[in-house]
Amino acid sequence: MGQKETFYRNWNGGGDFLRTVFGLGGLDHTNDSPAEQRYVNSLETSSMMAENDIGSLMPLVYTTVAFFVAVVLPHGSPMSNSHSSKKAFALLNWPRVLTSRNIWSISHGIFAASMFGSFWVQSAVGTIPLFGIVGFSWAVTCRIPYYLLHDELYRSSTQRNRQGDDLTDSQGLIHGIHNFSICLAQIVVLLMINTVWILASDDDGDSFLVWFLLLGGACALLAMYFTTRLREPENIKYEEIAMEEGDYGFSE
């Protein structure tokens, strides 16, 4: 299974999260009487100020989690830099079962759990852990897919070099397809969101936001399934290739 399908479904889930999670609205009280409306406005003003102060911690928690996950993730891909990758796994005591593919699958599961949790969480405090853990998924998505892509290109280039072929043009095409799949998913999600918002402008928008988040969770589960179908990179050692062709597996 190629990575581009998983990229597309992953960003279908991630796009609507990035578009809506920082813009959740309040309840609509336009049908209340004037006296009730003034009372509700007074309560909402004080409550909104308190919730905004608490809710502002959510982006901080999200970015902090993403930062620390990016730090502790093993640096380098297992194929192109097997020695450094093994050293990183040993240093951080990473279990061998946590391969690049499995870590990416787990990140999809965490994202889906967060999106589905938005159906029940209704407080500003609840959004802090709910969306803060998505920082893990974001950090993994910004790194692991490119490791897998690099490993696939490295494997192909090694085979082509052994056959005397040039893979330079093909590598550019593969990168272009992956970038296109990422951009296309975000465009599709934003068009869906804007279309529904226009059609439902007179209705309660909060319910539509929740359903969009649930849709993101469903897309994340689909991406998780496709991720499990990806082939694990083979552990090709530099030393073995260098003995055959020299210069770390690339002919001059």
Swiss-Prot record:
Molecular functions (GO terms): sucrose:proton symporter activity
UniProt entry tagged with the keyword Aminoacyl-tRNA synthetase: no
Transmembrane feature ranges: 54-74, 116-136, 180-200, 208-228
InterPro entries per the UniProt record, alphabetical: MFS_trans_sf
Similarity comment: family membership: Belongs to the major facilitator superfamily.
Changes seen on gene knockout: Impairs the production of cyclochlorotine.
Lipid bilayer topology: Multi-pass membrane protein
Role of this protein: MFS-type transporter; part of the gene cluster that mediates the biosynthesis of the mycotoxin cyclochlorotine, a hepatotoxic and carcinogenic cyclic chlorinated pentapeptide. Most likely responsible for cyclochlorotine secretion and thereby may contribute to intrinsic resistance.
Name by which UniProt lists this protein: MFS-type transporter cctQ
Keyword annotations of the record: Glycoprotein, Membrane, Transmembrane, Transmembrane helix, Transport, Virulence
